[in-house]
């Protein structure tokens, strides 16, 4: 995993020299893995507020702009850190896309419905994602990650 991190960090440094400090999300995803498709839509088609999702069957990441704004406002009371929040959501979804264990963990979950497996899937995505965006404030990243994982902690506490 350390080699993967160093590989991506070196790519990020090169990209930042080429495009300055601003990098768009599509270019970033393409630089990480050109086989991943990024789709940015206005809002999630269901009733839940979903900022992003990864679809393994199409190797696609979907980001939902309105939902990301709603989540950011809900967590922080404003959209002051919206750009960083969007990068964090993208990095998390990239974490799913790059997780070599995702398919096997998902298959095990389908068989067992063990919430611990879902928690592991999410933790893997957060761990991988964090390494992709060292230019984002680490305390902000940790806060968002912890908020995201809180639901799983509550569910696992009910079981034990």
Residue map of PLM features:
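A metal-dependent hydrolase signature that marks the N-terminal structural subdomain at the beginning
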Residues: 1-59
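Long, well-structured alpha-helical subdomains associated
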Residues: 6-14, 80-84, 118, 127-160
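Short, flexible/disordered intra-domain loops and linkers
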Residues: 13-15, 72-80, 109-114
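Hydrophobic (often cysteine-bearing) scaffold residues that line and stabilize catalytic clefts
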Residues: 21, 87, 121, 125
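Active-site scaffold of zinc-dependent metalloenzymes
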Residues: 40-84
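Glycine-rich, flexible loop segments associated with nucleotide phosphate handling
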Residues: 77-90, 114-120
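Active-site recognition of the HExxH zinc-binding catalytic motif
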Residues: 85-102
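Post-HEXXH active-site segment of zinc metalloproteases
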Residues: 100-127
């Amino acid at each position: 995993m350390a080699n993967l991190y160093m590989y991506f960090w070196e790519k990020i440094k090169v990209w930042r020299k080429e495009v300055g400090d601003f990098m768009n999300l599509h270019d970033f995803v393409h630089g990480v893995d050109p086989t991943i498709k990024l789709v940015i839509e206005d809002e999630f088609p269901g009733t839940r507020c979903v900022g992003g999702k990864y679809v393994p069957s199409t190797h696609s990441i979907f980001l939902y702009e309105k939902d990301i704004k709603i989540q950011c406002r809900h967590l922080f009371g404003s959209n002051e850190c919206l750009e960083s929040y969007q990068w964090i959501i993208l990095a998390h979804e990239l974490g799913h896309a790059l997780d070599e264990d995702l398919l096997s963990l998902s298959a095990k979950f389908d068989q067992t419905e063990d919430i611990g497996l879902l928690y592991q899937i999410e933790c893997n995505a957060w761990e991988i994602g964090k390494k992709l965006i060292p230019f984002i404030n680490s305390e902000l990243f940790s806060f968002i990650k912890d908020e995201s994982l809180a639901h799983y902690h509550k569910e696992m506490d009910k079981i034990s």
